[in-house]
């Protein structure tokens, strides 16, 4: 009996560590870091890369974490209590606001669309999660995992590389992460799968090169026929 209790505690601790390591807040920053290390963007000036990484870090990790922490302390909520559906709105709104400011800052810096698209796709995912949260609950962790996999497919079309090994790695990570969220009883299987699907679809639609072409064509067609 004691062995089972120890095993259960170890499993829960492991699940908590996995959830903490693969937090949705870190995904945009890590995506930019990977782009600057493994793609042709590594040839860009170091100062430019540091500025972009600094902006992304401030608005997607530092500001959301800080504002949610302050909100939690003011209201006396524990991290576990914020998992409840009705208490998730304010953290979502705080994070969405921070991402909007990040997009505005990146626009002022004239950062290319395929970089701002990472933030835009994350923003779209969060807005959908807020809307769905009115009646149901999606896993933001799995939405982030789905967005990463969708981004890999989209960027493979843009940068012409074979994403198979990267896809294998991140699909495995997504499976482990989804299992961890279920073990912690933060989400059901349906919420995990729903979050993954939302992240995957949004990321593909926003980041795929074909989407950028369509976004450019529609204003031109509208201008021609007006």
Predicted feature locations:
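Membrane-embedded catalytic cores of phosphoryl/pyrophosphoryl-handling enzymes
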Residues: 112-226
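Juxtamembrane helix-capping/reentrant segments at transmembrane boundaries
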Residues: 18, 78-94
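Loop-to-helix transition at the N-terminal end of transmembrane alpha-helices
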Residues: 45-61, 85-86
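Membrane-interface helix termini and inter-helical loops of multi-pass transporters
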Residues: 39-48, 77-80, 108-110, 211-224
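Transmembrane alpha-helical segments of multi-pass membrane transport proteins and ion-pumping complexes
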Residues: 24-29, 60-69, 96-104, 122-130, ...
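The first (N-terminal) embedded transmembrane alpha-helix
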Residues: 18-39
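Core segments of transmembrane alpha-helices
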Residues: 93-103, 144-149
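Short, Lys/Arg-rich, polar N-terminal cytosolic tail immediately upstream
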Residues: 1-15
